Amino acid sequence: MRDFLTEEQVKTLKITHRSLRHKKLADRIKAVLMLHFGFTYSQISQALILDEVTLRRYLENFQEKGVDGLL
């Protein structure tokens, strides 16, 4: 999966990520951004130490509710 976010969505995610102090919430945003930039679920799973089912749920939540679905 690659290039599925608009520039505005990437900007919003990055701004939100910088403002978060809670690691789990930040990881959710990182996961969505990494998918957008072409990382595979497997690569993200290894990097963030999360299982692929969880990553897919994060993406689904984002697609349904936007940034609020990740928080």
Q: How would you name each of these model-derived features?
A:
Residues 1-71:
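Short, basic alpha-helical/linker "hinge" immediately adjacent to a nucleic-acid-recognition surface
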